[in-house]
Design a protein with these regions (language model features):
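Catalytic micro-motifs at enzyme active sites that drive phosphoryl/nucleotidyl and oxygen chemistry
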Residues: 80-83, 93-95, 128-129
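Canonical Radical SAM [4Fe-4S] cluster-binding loop centered on the CxxxCxxC motif
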Residues: 86-120, 175
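Flexible, acidic/Gly-rich N-terminal and inter-domain linker regions that tether
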Residues: 1-86
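Glycine-rich, often proline-containing surface loops adjacent to acidic residues and nearby aromatics
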Residues: 103, 137-143
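Conserved AdoMet/S-adenosylmethionine-binding subsite of the radical SAM
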Residues: 124-139, 150-220
């Protein structure tokens, strides 16, 4: 079940999740407004996704902390690794960073604290953890998400290579990103190089609305 944090009445203050919109999304919003109008379904579809609404500042009775409390607990004598969640025996969610190119309104990642980005050493340790018993006995797939992992493609190479070396039990690596729909220019040779000679790597585009599937996004 979803984890719901009940706040004392005095603490029912809204979370400040700042508006963050890429220049490319700003241009797209302007184009849709000029072409269809500010209150049109075409413009609102994108604006509701990224433009901060004043109602977000109103107090609320409860807040959803996460979809599920699935963070991995480590023994007291071990140093815990950030960004690991496990929902099922055969799969694991890895969040190498909580940074994104743009902030989707009402994203539950806003409630994840503290914010972090894994170091190269931590990425290698994550791969070793996934490749060691008893975790490796059932783990066959990982989902790399965030945040958005493609905000740092140069760092992901370290994580992918670590899995190849230390976690051969992981047969599928899924990479979830909104970068193609938020800032398609970032899908350059540095990003594409991640997929070279990695047949077990799958890319998944996270989107809910057709307005984000622009020609540039589809090309990316």
């Amino acid at each position: 079940a979803a984890a719901v944090v009940k706040l004392p009445l005095s603490d029912k203050k809204p979370l400040v999740f700042k508006e963050l919109i890429t220049p490319w999304l700003h241009r797209k919003l302007d184009e849709l407004e000029q072409r269809y109008g500010k209150d049109s379904p075409e413009h609102r579809a994108l604006a509701l996704q990224y433009v901060k609404d004043g109602r977000e500042d109103e107090p609320m009775d409860e807040r959803n902390a996460k979809h599920y409390e699935a963070g991995i607990s480590f023994p007291e004598n071990e140093t815990g690794l950030p960004g690991l969640e496990r929902f099922y025996r055969r799969s694991m969610v890895i969040e190498p960073t909580l940074s994104c190119a743009a902030h989707c309104r009402y994203c539950l990642r806003a409630y994840y604290a503290p914010k972090f980005t894994m170091s190269d050493h931590q990425m290698v340790q994550v791969a070793k953890y996934c490749g060691s018993p008893p975790v490796s006995d059932h783990l066959r797939e990982v989902l790399i998400t965030g945040g958005d992992p493609l905000v740092m493609p140069h760092r992901l190479e370290t994580l992918f290579n670590a899995f190849i070396e230390h976690a051969p039990n992981v047969r599928t690596i899924r990479l979830a990103s909104r970068i193609p729909t938020q800032d398609p220019g970032r899908i350059d040779q540095n990003a594409l190089r991640l997929f070279h000679n990695k047949p077990s790597l799958r890319f998944e585009l996270a989107t809910q609305i057709n307005a984000t599937l622009t020609p540039l996004a589809q090309a990316a």
